[in-house]
Amino acid sequence: MNAQNYTQKSLEAIQAAQKLTIENQNQQIEQIHLLAALLRQENGLVPQLLKKMGITLESFEAAVDAELGKLPRVTGSGREADKYYVARAVDTALNSAEDIAKQMKDEYVSVEHLFLSLIENADATLKNLFRPYQITKEACLQALQSVRGNQRVTSDTPEDTYEALAKYGTDLVK
């Protein structure tokens, strides 16, 4: 993973997943940590995508938090502070996100690539989470198209340009 190929929001999400792992006293970063980090990003794209997909955020976040709580904790004198591992499924998802960015002809790996990769390479926990909410790659791509349009990721802060008109414009017809 080359950090220079990731957008600022993507790197923030990865760092937040690491922090969440430490706070929850988990031994390794799992896909659920990365998903939770993507959901909790301030003005994040993933919550926007989920809303466009017709998903109630509060309900989905509660389900994610419940799964986080089920992860084994490592405490006591044998635990080395701030030492954790990256689960193989997370490594696979990060590598896949880079491939997805290339397929979409984007120059940087953005949060949408991370989210799509988590959907595509979901471990058992995420598959069980996504199934009742009908979160699929196709639904996500459709939501992404409505948010992003034909824009490509050509800077390390592309999320700021998505739906700029809706954020900063005024509808004079209303």
Indicate where each model-derived feature is located:
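Histone-fold recognition with a strong bias for associated Lys/Arg-rich disordered tails
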Residues: 1-174
